[in-house]
């Protein structure tokens, strides 16, 4: 059985969350653990992946966007999306060498974990041909955008629990114009974020065949093997 660590946080500014990811990345790179799953919410932020640009898929003036939320260009795949309170963001920092060096399989498994989670709440979700993420009909409930370096993953998924969906109205989320977004709340499911996080950990353990130990931020200090 693979062994990993899970870190559950509250509402975190985007750049602070990125720094936490980088610390986790270094720990996984040193093979101190097979993977680290970071769970949090972000303060309102729009992020643009490597396929997007500032002039694409933003439906209002940039200055107005920046009044509503932070805006960053980031390393993950995909185009623009929104993160904010009421959304479970999961950053799996996994060494794919411990599984299979197959990015498509990794994304498939991320989707599978969310699909299984939503099924427990009576939400029938699935995949959509030609698109990533998890969908309920023609509306996306969970976005996926990852980056991989040295077969270690970072960035991740964003599941809309009770997110303010009006933020998505200012953009073409993920560059998609013909379909919309939804949330668990919009689908009639009222649930606490912490409960969703706990159940998502369970689904990650099932799908990725890994056992997590819960840690806090102090455990992300990377051991210098030269001094150990």
Curated annotation (Swiss-Prot):
Cellular compartments per GO CC: cytoplasm
Keyword 4Fe-4S set for record: no
Pfam families: LplA-B_cat
Catalysed reactions listed for this entry: octanoyl-[ACP] + L-lysyl-[protein] = N(6)-octanoyl-L-lysyl-[protein] + holo-[ACP] + H(+)
Organism of derivation: Caldanaerobacter subterraneus subsp. tengcongensis (strain DSM 15242 / JCM 11007 / NBRC 100824 / MB4)
Pathway stated in the Swiss-Prot or TrEMBL entry: Protein modification; protein lipoylation via endogenous pathway; protein N(6)-(lipoyl)lysine from octanoyl-[acyl-carrier-protein]: step 1/2
Chain's gene name: lipB
Lineage: Bacteria, Bacillati, Bacillota, Clostridia, Thermoanaerobacterales
Protein name listed in UniProt: Octanoyltransferase
A molecular-function term among this protein's GO annotations: lipoyl(octanoyl) transferase activity
Purpose: Catalyzes the transfer of endogenously produced octanoic acid from octanoyl-acyl-carrier-protein onto the lipoyl domains of lipoate-dependent enzymes. Lipoyl-ACP can also act as a substrate although octanoyl-ACP is likely to be the physiological substrate.
């Amino acid at each position: 059985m693979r062994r990993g660590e899970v870190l559950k946080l509250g509402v975190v500014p985007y750049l602070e969350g990125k720094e936490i990811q980088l610390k986790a990345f270094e720990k996984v790179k040193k093979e101190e653990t097979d993977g680290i799953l970071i769970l949090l919410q972000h303060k309102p932020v729009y992020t643009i992946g490597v396929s997007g640009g500032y002039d694409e898929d933003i439906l209002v003036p940039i200055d107005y966007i920046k009044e509503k939320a932070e805006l960053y260009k980031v390393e993950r795949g995909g185009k623009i999306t929104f993160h904010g309170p009421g959304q479970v963001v999961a950053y799996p920092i996994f060494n794919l060498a411990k599984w299979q060096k197959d990015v498509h399989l990794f994304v498939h498994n991320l989707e599978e974990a969310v699909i299984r989670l939503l099924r427990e709440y009576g939400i029938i979700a699935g995949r959509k041909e030609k698109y990533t993420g998890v969908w309920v009909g023609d509306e996306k409930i969970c976005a996926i955008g990852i980056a991989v370096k040295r077969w270690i993953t970072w960035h991740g998924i964003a599941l809309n629990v009770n997110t303010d969906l009006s933020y998505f109205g200012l953009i073409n989320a993920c560059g998609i114009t013909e379909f919309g977004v939804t949330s668990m709340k919009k689908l009639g499911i009222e649930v606490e974020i912490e409960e969703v996080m706990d159940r998502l950990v369970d689904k990650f353990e099932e799908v990725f065949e890994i056992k997590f130990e819960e840690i806090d931020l102090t455990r992300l200090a990377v051991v210098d093997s030269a001094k150990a």
